[in-house]
Amino acid sequence: MLFRSSALSEGMSWNWESFPEYLDALEELPRAIDVATQVPHGAVRAYVMGDRGAGNEAPTGSDIDAMACIVEEGLRAGALGFSTSRTVLHKSIEGELVPGTTADPEELIGIARGMAKAGHGVFEMSSDLVPEWNEFDWMGDMSRETGLPVTFTALQSPVKAMNLDDQLAKMRSQNARGANILAQIAMRGTGLILGWRTSFNPFSFKPSWAEVAALNEADQLAKLADPAFKKKLLSETSVYPESDLQFLGQLMAEGFEMQYALTDDFNYEPTKEQSIANLAAVDGASGDEYA
């Protein structure tokens, strides 16, 4: 979920420090629905370790113990579990990985031991599931040692090195040896909205896009309609900044087989025939020409 930082600074009174105090603050807020909470790894790590935690440095044994105590306290106060992020898609406003992204199994299992002391809780993780990280090995070890259920975000994604079938096979293998790992799926496919007035579109990485990116809507559309500018823009090759998110930029600029027109019916299950790539082929055009 993405939101402006001003929504937090203007919409919340920061009148707590501990997790139990946070729950008390939530209790005082008017709301239309019930809410459940998880103790967040990033906040706990930064609180215990300061800049070392925010910078994803390795913790000491005492750091891990302190984090485990805070998480245990949070669960005893009413949290349903603990959550951690291990994906390069989750970054701070400065572009840095959120605290805990690269935490090693010793830290994660140490925190889970604190959860076990509380007597309940679900350990939740969102990960890129890079094969070399051996995520399912430590998830299995954690669950078997602590008895906790461990859940991960199971997605079929063009940017994940491990497909969904492999994810589920590894989960079942660990569970056959006594672990309790569960896969969580999205209620619908997730994606990005691309357009002239959004943060990105298929032409954002072409050099000439800089000429129109900051224009107001009327001037931008007029420039894009200019045949000479359109020809120049289409002739250029996208230039991607060096980043661990480069693959995402390439998908936005070149992944027309996975891009669809957003129509008034908001169809979240379009067919392959409705993709920009297929419509372009039918029209005898390239993907970027059609877009």
Language-model segment annotations:
Residues 12-21:
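Core domains of carbohydrate- and sulfate-ester-processing enzymes
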Residues 25, 32, 38-48, 55-63, ...:
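Active-site neighborhoods of metal-dependent hydrolases
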Residues 5-13:
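A gly/proline- and charged-residue-enriched helix-loop-helix capping module
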